Amino acid sequence: MPTSVAIIGAGFSGTLTAIHLARTPATDSSIDIYLIDPRGSFGPGLAYSPPSERFKLNVRAKAMGAFPDDVEGFYRWERERYPNTSPDDFCPRSHYGEYLSDLLNKAVGQAHGHTLHRLTDEVIGIDRNADSGKWAVSLKSGDTITVDGCVIAIGNLMNASTTSAQSTIRFREPFNPKSYDDISKSQTVFILGSGLTAVDTILECEARGFTGTYTILSRHGRFPRPHESLPSSAVAHLPENWNTCGSVRALDEP
């Protein structure tokens, strides 16, 4: 196993990678874990550090545990801090960011001789030495760290058309708290896409007293549908030890 790993990006994926490395049983060598993020926030990332608690998760609390063997972990964490939470609640995204940060802190406290270095910096280059196989990670601060392994966890990047829009002064990043500060209450707000983030954006604008017009452009022209319970009749036809592939095959059978 590598004795040093750089993780670029400290959102959900980067944070969970760091947690799993910190949980690795002790061997002959400990692991130096470098978790690097320019935001200085380790855990929430962009998705779970929205401008207000009006931005909600799109999965119920009881199913948002970070680990597959503990799917109710987040719900227990939430109940300890917010006792009125029910298993079926859609909790604020910011709460999930706090949960991830707590998991990281706990993993570091229980690390098996491994060390986590949290670096508030931006990675500007990665080069691999052909002879040693090690990675040189160049940082905006001017520092360079040399590691045995490198994980790129920079999130879901914007597509080319959205990236080009960022250069205009009217572009707003929906998860940036400052994005809504200078929007006139009577302006027209154009929203590209009609998914859950579009709904979050509208709710945030409404809460800030927006009285203007929303123009929404979407390929399918539909808002998200509400979650529905699976009919008991459908469950009855599933095999006892079902999985996704097996269910698809069963549906294909005449």
Task: Show the residue positions of the predicted features.
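Helical element adjacent to the flavin cofactor pocket in flavoenzyme catalytic cores
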Residues: 97-117
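A conserved short coil-to-beta-strand element within the FAD-binding core of flavoproteins
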Residues: 119-133
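Generic recognition of long tandem-repeat/solenoid scaffolds
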Residues: 135-139
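Core beta-strand elements of the Rossmann-like FAD/NAD(P) dinucleotide-binding domain
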Residues: 140-149, 184
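Glycine-rich active-site loop/strand segments that organize a redox cofactor
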Residues: 36-102, 217-254
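Rossmann-like dinucleotide-binding core of oxidoreductases
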Residues: 7, 11-41, 151-254
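Extreme N-terminal starter segment of soluble prokaryotic enzymes
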Residues: 1-5
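General small-molecule cofactor/ligand-binding pocket signal
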Residues: 117-119, 215
